[in-house]
Amino acid sequence: MKKVTVGAAVVGAAAVCAVAALIVNHRMRKSSKWGRAMAILREFEEKCKTQDAKLKQVADAMTVEMHAGLASEGGQSSRCLSPMSIISQLVMKLGVFYALDLGGTNFRVLRVQLGGKDGGIIHQEFAEASIPPSLMVGTSDALFDYIAAELAKFVAAEEEKFHQPPGKQRELGFHLLIPSNADFNNSGTIMRWTKGFSIDDAVGQDVVGELTKAMKEKVLDMRVSALVNDTVGTLAGGKYTQKDVAVAVILGTGTNAAYVERVQAIPKWHGPVPKSGEMVINMEWGNFRSSHLPLTEYDHALDNESLNPAEQIFEKMTSGMYLGEILRRVLTRVAEEVLAFLAMRSLQSLKDSFVLRTPDMSAMHHDTSPDLKVVGEKLKDILEISNTSLKTRKLVLSLCNIVATRGARLDAAGVLGILKKMGRDTPKQGGSERTVIAMDGGLYEHYTEYRMCLENSLKDLLGEELATSIVFVHSNDGSGIGAALLRASHSMYLEDQA
């Protein structure tokens, strides 16, 4: 009997040891997987570093590109647009003007009523419509037919007080967020598509002519009399209320910048000189690239698989269309190596490109709850990653911060490059000139962490003394309103050239 008891005890002890060994082994494997996840995070963080010294290198490279772009037509980053003198006279106009805001997955139509010199903007309203994905990769005719139809709906619903008298056409400022040869006239061609568009038959075509044709087919009595770039529109909209606006930056689905330059500093400009002696420069800075940009394997893969590989590199690192996608790619790498750690049955939910949008990333980044509830909900609802631990959510939050911080600090470097080109990057005796930067776009407006990082980074780069003279203002709907304002001043543009 004793032998049986002893034998049973031995067997029981062995079983306990075996279970304990399995538990220890499981914990070791789990610990090992967590270690790999953290290693991926640390590696990504290291490659995304944007020390002040690196940002100053990026700013210097931006300035060099700006000089090159202004020197000859071969420069790709800067192109001369509308004379600055038109903006100072915007307040003189009376009447109702329209603007079409096109360049992302949505487009807007605006109606602006101006009250003249003392009246300012009396009334403004807009309607927004989504562009079906099929039209973003279809034909030019199909896209502009859809836009004209939405324009017609907007006009049909307007109040009687906005109706034009017989014989007078409604006048439209066409605000285009796509890189184009916009000449502040009633013509212009698309240089290349960005922001998810890929319509081959529209490249090189007169987009104003295409829109005009579509409006005629809809029997819409409206004339396009100004083709305006997004940042030029934002600068005009900001200048309407603040005379010190000298720079405009768009941070939305895409990104771009414009600034005020002296005509003498534009060697390639051979046209008439406006009375102000200044011009607005559209930079197309989304297409900026430099060896100093902290690119990672995730950025290279995103670029290679995009509709426009090797183009818009700066935009792909800093704009609302791509930030969430960069995060998704890093999470996919984590999941591939640490599948059990993420409690996932399949990687399929992470395989869909752009399934994780930047607004989702922003919501997670702004989560301050003790258990990071929003992060957990987003992972479950969008990526089908359920039952995540707190440390998993913290890892995701850290990745959000890395992606956003890199983008915001690179934007700050871009602004520093502009200020450097304008000679406003160093303190002046007697006090520095006040410079107002008009900002527009959903990324800047809604992603608070991104906005604060950008502004604080620029302050650090400039130094405390100079930073007090640089002011950021949110020019809400500035680009679209600016397009309407520039349309209103079109006749003055001709007078300035006389």
From Swiss-Prot:
InterPro entries the UniProt entry points to: ATPase_NBD (IPR043129), Hexokinase (IPR001312), Hexokinase_C (IPR022673), Hexokinase_N (IPR022672)
Tissue expression pattern: Expressed in young and mature leaves, stems, roots, stolons, and developing and mature tubers.
Key words of the record: ATP-binding, Chloroplast, Glycolysis, Kinase, Membrane, Nucleotide-binding, Plastid, Plastid outer membrane, Transferase, Transmembrane, Transmembrane helix
Region annotation Hexokinase large subdomain: where it falls in the sequence: 229-477
Keyword Oxidoreductase: no
Region (Hexokinase small subdomain): 89-228
Chain residues that bind D-glucose: 194-195, 229-230, 256, 284, 315
GO terms of biological process kind: glucose 6-phosphate metabolic process; glucose metabolic process; glycolytic process; intracellular glucose homeostasis
Catalytic reaction equation(s): a D-hexose + ATP = a D-hexose 6-phosphate + ADP + H(+); D-fructose + ATP = D-fructose 6-phosphate + ADP + H(+); D-glucose + ATP = D-glucose 6-phosphate + ADP + H(+)
Pathway: Carbohydrate metabolism; hexose metabolism; Carbohydrate degradation; glycolysis; D-glyceraldehyde 3-phosphate and glycerone phosphate from D-glucose: step 1/4
Domain Hexokinase: 35-488
Membrane topology: Single-pass membrane protein
Subcellular location: Plastid, Chloroplast outer membrane
Any one GO molecular-function label of the UniProt entry: ATP binding
Principal EC category: transferase
Residue sites binding ADP per the record: 104-106, 253, 442
Family: Belongs to the hexokinase family.
Function: Fructose and glucose phosphorylating enzyme. May be involved in the phosphorylation of glucose during the export from plastids to cytosol. Seems neither to be involved in cell sugar sensing nor in carbohydrate metabolism in tuber.
Protein name according to UniProt: Hexokinase-1
Source species of the chain: Solanum tuberosum (Potato)
